[in-house]
Design a protein with these regions (language model features):
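Short acidic-hydrophobic surface loop/beta-edge motif
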Residues: 74-77, 105, 210-217
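Active-site HxH/HxHxD metal-binding segment of metal-dependent hydrolases
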Residues: 131-213, 233
Length: 362
């Protein structure tokens, strides 16, 4: 995207669906001159067309042209590992759509990014922080699932030369299918200007179904693992054995109440969490999808135990023949101080109830 100062002027023309008004004006003027059908007008038309093409090339190689946004400062989790902890609420214009975590891991051969960011401006701003930490190039990017705040910034990373992009296959296929719909929703909820420059680079991703191991130099590897669905139908978790470091994706929430979406299934979430916990050491350091870095015991309490306990209470209502009134009355006050509790407590309970009732009717 092209920004001057803090006022956005235009969006990067990275695809036919995202036309920079500045570039488009030269293309339109070129067409108007060409329509005059004289040798002079044709020469002038070619000049303007060439200029527009050159501007487009410069903007695309830059990925983003504009100010660095005041996103949260990356925190050092351990040596060579940094995470920007996103807002604990929804993505909004005020937080630039950044309500999940963005991480950078520095290896001998370069930097590995986990999550592309909700837009190119946030991705660029995170990149500037990385450049102040290390002069090593960003070489790899993995995204946690098929949500916009994981994927949309990927077009920035691709434009600046990151060619090793990774995602679980089902998530990548799904994001391609819902790209325009999701982009429109993000534009309405987080701002048109900050969203409009993103474009679909799912065809540039290397996909996997279960696991994929990546050699990142210095004898270290990164393991990409689809631990299973739950919050979303599938996901890309990441484990680095040499650092004993786990990226749980949205299977793990810390502080913030985890949320059940339209395509979420709580039983699958519980099962996937169990699988994840069984595949890593108990003393692993965890960077969750939402919330601050933590340990597995805390993550289990904040996510897994939350769902198991709520499930048990909802099951009691189902067994006694109760309905939504009883579901809404379930006491969840122990979680009342967690961010977005008021927005998610009842909807989560209702989601579990509806899921149980649907299974009961089979």
């Amino acid at each position: 995207a092209l920004f001057i100062g803090t006022a956005p002027l235009s969006a990067l023309a990275s695809s036919s669906q995202n036309t920079d008004p500045y570039i488009a004006s030269f293309k339109a003027y070129s067409d108007e001159i060409k329509a005059l059908d004289t040798s002079t007008s044709k020469a002038a038309s070619n000049t303007f067309q060439t200029y527009a093409d050159e501007v487009f090339s410069v903007e695309q190689k830059a990925g983003y042209i504009g100010d660095e946004l005041p996103i949260p400062k990356a925190v050092k989790v351990m040596e060579g590992v940094y995470t920007v902890v996103g807002s604990f609420i929804w993505g909004t214009p005020a937080n630039f759509g950044l309500n999940n975590n963005l991480s950078a891991i520095i290896f001998e051969d370069g930097v590995f990014i986990y999550n592309g960011g909700p837009n190119e401006a946030v991705a660029y701003s995170f990149h500037q922080q990385i450049k102040r930490i290390t002069n090593k190039p960003v070489k790899w990017l993995a995204v946690e699932n098929d949500q916009g705040h994981a994927y949309f910034g990927s077009s920035y990373w691709y434009d600046v030369g990151v060619k090793n992009l990774y995602s679980e296959k089902r998530a990548n296929d799904n994001f391609h299918q819902i790209f325009e719909e999701t982009k429109d929703r993000y534009a309405k909820g987080r701002g048109t200007t900050i969203t409009q420059s993103v474009y679909d680079v799912t065809d540039k991703f290397t996909t996997f179904s279960d696991t994929k191991t990546i050699d990142v130099g210095g004898g270290e590897t990164v393991q990409l693992i689809n631990f299973g669905g739950g919050h979303t139908p599938s996901m890309t978790g990441m484990y680095i054995p040499s650092r004993n470091l786990l990226f749980s994706g949205d299977l793990g929430f810390n502080e913030r109440v985890p949320g059940l979406l339209n395509d979420s299934f709580f039983k699958e979430w519980i099962s996937s969490f169990e699988k994840m916990a069984s595949m890593v050491p108990s003393d692993v350091t965890v960077i969750p999808g939402h919330g601050t870095p933590t340990d597995m015991a805390t993550l289990k309490r904040q996510t897994y135990d939350y769902f198991v306990e709520l499930y048990q209470e909802v099951q009691k209502v189902v067994d006694s023949g109760g309905g939504l009134a009883e579901i809404d009355a379930i006491d969840q006050s122990k979680h009342k101080d967690r961010p977005v509790f008021s927005q998610l407590s009842i909807s989560n309970a209702r989601h579990i109830y509806n899921e149980l009732m649907a299974q009961k009717s089979l």
